[in-house]
Amino acid sequence: MPLMPKRTKHRKMQKGQFAGLSKGANFVHFGEYGIQVLERGWITNQQIEACRVAINRFFQRRGKVWIRIFPDKPITKKPAEVRMGKGKGAVDHWVAVVRPGRILFEVANVPKDMAQSALRRAAAKLGLKTRFVERVEQV
């Protein structure tokens, strides 16, 4: 089942702005290791699911995975070969807006090299530059 909100206040949304850095979720909070995005962009619900499957298959029921993003922005699309105008198209898919510094996935209870390999496989499915990060204790 695809990731999407159960209910929304409005069916359709405007494009919005990408400016600035991530306002929160900049540190590994739940797990021991994570991947942090280095550029701004959209990540679709299908990409998030593909990453989750890739990580879980690599771990083979070991470890724990946290998904730190959620696709809450609807993207609309008009059908093929339809003239311009006549209103906004129907909702096609959902995306999560990410800005630089955002932690996307976190993992725990696995060795560092295994976590790095799994998160590298997940990052390959995103189309954005990412880096591997470790948990830093906050003072």
From Swiss-Prot:
A GO BP annotation: translation
Protein name listed in UniProt: Large ribosomal subunit protein uL16
Organism of this sequence: Protochlamydia amoebophila (strain UWE25)
CDD domains linked to this entry: Ribosomal_L16_L10e
Keyword Ribonucleoprotein assigned: yes
UniProt-listed InterPro entries: Ribosomal_uL16, Ribosomal_uL16_bact-type, Ribosomal_uL16_CS, Ribosomal_uL16_dom, Ribosomal_uL16_sf
Domain of life: Bacteria
HAMAP family (UniProt xref): Ribosomal_uL16
GO molecular function: rRNA binding; structural constituent of ribosome; tRNA binding
SUPFAM superfamilies hit by this protein: Ribosomal protein L16p/L10e (SSF54686)
Keywords noted in UniProt: Ribonucleoprotein, Ribosomal protein, RNA-binding, rRNA-binding, tRNA-binding
Family: Belongs to the universal ribosomal protein uL16 family.
Keyword Cytoplasm: no
UniProt gene name: rplP
S-S pairs: none
